[in-house]
């Protein structure tokens, strides 16, 4: 039975009516880009998460997939794996540079071709190359992350999207193949202090340059290792992209120690518009997919639940940075 056949009658009626209306309003949308986190934008239907797998056959996994993301991580289900090595970041000893974009869906940082930034270790058997840093956040504090821990959300989630450079030549090819992608997620809370890396992205001089959709601003001299806590544990599972086409080729690595940004920085994020300046303001906030069933997937972690009182200490709980002057 196809995805459309399993669609409930009310949702089917809404979809068919909306598609019929869309057919009479201007040119046809690009099928590869016709999706949103909200079903209604400026009075026009744009497929939100419940409809992603129904408007494009290439996105069918968004409806029928059994390894979808994001998920709610219940810590009691996490299996301690003492053989997980520490995560390793390779920057070649160079500072990161690239372009910060307002894509209309996310705040996105696309690194320049050089230096190449790779991540390995942890659950990864291959080296993965950084392709994008993506920031998701909510309209209110504590409700902006895609993933949850013990049913608890966070104000924002930073996702570092990597592709398997040993098996694939680029992100697009890796999205279509097995063992293709690795996404590192870091959760963000609102507090009185701010993570130094995020402060570079969210200071007033920078964030006001990307107020509207398609705005872009070039940044340089970024130290990516400053994004990570000094010490941390992580939880990993097999999942999918949380945007169309929802490909089930992602190894997710969730860092279990949250970062901080200030309330002013969070407010500045919520003032970003998902539209160009010629259109009505709609906040970029609320740019996450709803939770998906974990089902029978395994959750593995490198923190020993038999000793929850112990803080993460030692080299296994630090990011190993190749090429840094003194490492971490």
Curated annotation (Swiss-Prot):
Comp. bias (Basic and acidic residues): 319-328
Location in the cell reads: Secreted
Species lineage = Eukaryota, Metazoa, Chordata, Craniata, Vertebrata
- Where would I find the Alpha-carbonic anhydrase domain in this sequence? 33-303
What InterPro entries does this protein's entry cite? Alpha_CARP_X/XI, CA_dom, CA_dom_sf, Carbonic_anhydrase_a-class
What PANTHER family has UniProt attached to this entry? CARBONIC ANHYDRASE (PTHR18952), CARBONIC ANHYDRASE-RELATED PROTEIN 11 (PTHR18952:SF93)
- Residue spans making up a coiled coil are none
- Segments of this protein annotated with the region Disordered: 300-328
Q: Which family does it belong to?
A: Belongs to the alpha-carbonic anhydrase family.
Record GO terms (molecular function) = hydro-lyase activity; zinc ion binding
Glycan attachment residues as annotated in the record: 118, 170, 260
Protein name in UniProt: Carbonic anhydrase-related protein 11
Superkingdom, according to UniProt? Eukaryota
Gene3D superfamilies per UniProt: Alpha carbonic anhydrase (3.10.200.10)
Question: Which UniProt key words apply to this protein?
Answer: Glycoprotein, Secreted, Signal
The residues forming the signal peptide are 1-22
State a GO cellular component annotated for this protein. Answer: extracellular region
Q: Which Pfam families match?
A: Carb_anhydrase
Signal among keywords: yes
Q: What is its main location?
A: secreted
Its job: Does not have a catalytic activity.
